[in-house]
Amino acid sequence: MYEAIGHRVEDGVAEITIKLPRHRNALSVKAMQEVTDALNRAEEDDSVGAVMITGAEDAFCAGFYLREIPLDKGVAGVRDHFRIGALWWHQMIHKIIRVKRPVLAAINGVAAGGGLGISLASDMAICADSAKFVCAWHTIGIGNDTATSYSLARIVGMRRAMELMLTNRTLYPEEAKDWGLVSRVYPKDDFREVAWKVARELAAAPTHLQVMAKERFHAGWMQPVEECTEFEIQNVIASVTHPHFMPCLTEFLDGHRADRPQVELPAGV
């Protein structure tokens, strides 16, 4: 179905694998188009409860695939290529944020530039103890993109975001966890197995409630508290009229759900 990415649906999880390992899984324009299409398919597939984005072999994603830049076409050709690339990057990032499924970034290696942007746009992020994070844009002389000016400071705070961007330093897993870039760190050798376990847990949870939470948290960043609480009321009313609600309430009142977490995550390192 796809040429530039890996894709499969299993156990309610749509796995999207960025696969250009000889270039640390940098994303071509075609790959971005395919990731966006795969996200659209996941949203339309009732059997899919969660999406997992990861990278082939030992890297997550090193950003834009620079080797397809048409240097022989001069400044105008390079500019046009970056304009097209930025448009597709941003369509893909928008879809990760807006897709009506929880998205897990399973960061198995380097996440640089746009790869960092993908991890920030995802709803949850976990990483292997071999991962590393770096802004990287200034290394190649370009401004940051992939909505990092929207997401990075929101997740790690303005001071830390500016430190990462201005110094271009590499962040390693434990510090990334401490800063909130990822929620958990797992050993490299077990990472794919654990990532699939987390994704399956997300997929098994009630999709309509996951989507409500996702939409509310993103909207809440931009809205006054009064608007947030009004939408929360609407979500509560919608959720209690859903067929999922009454069995859950009955179990809870009978004492069967009081201490049961909705999604169980493996302990990290």
From Swiss-Prot:
Effect seen on changing residue 137 to F: Low catalytic activity, but KM unaffected. Retains catalytic activity, but substrate benzoyl group binding is decreased
Annotated PROSITE patterns? ENOYL_COA_HYDRATASE (PS00166)
Outcome, altering residue 45 to A? No effect on catalytic activity
Keywords linked to the UniProt accession = Hydrolase
Effect of mutating residue 67 to K = Reduces substrate CoA binding
Q: Does this entry carry the keyword Thylakoid?
A: no
User: What does induction of this protein depend on?
Assistant: By 4-chlorobenzoyl-CoA, 4-iodobenzoyl-CoA or 4-bromobenzoyl-CoA.
The protein's name in its UniProt record: 4-chlorobenzoyl coenzyme A dehalogenase
| Protein source organism | Pseudomonas sp. (strain CBS-3)
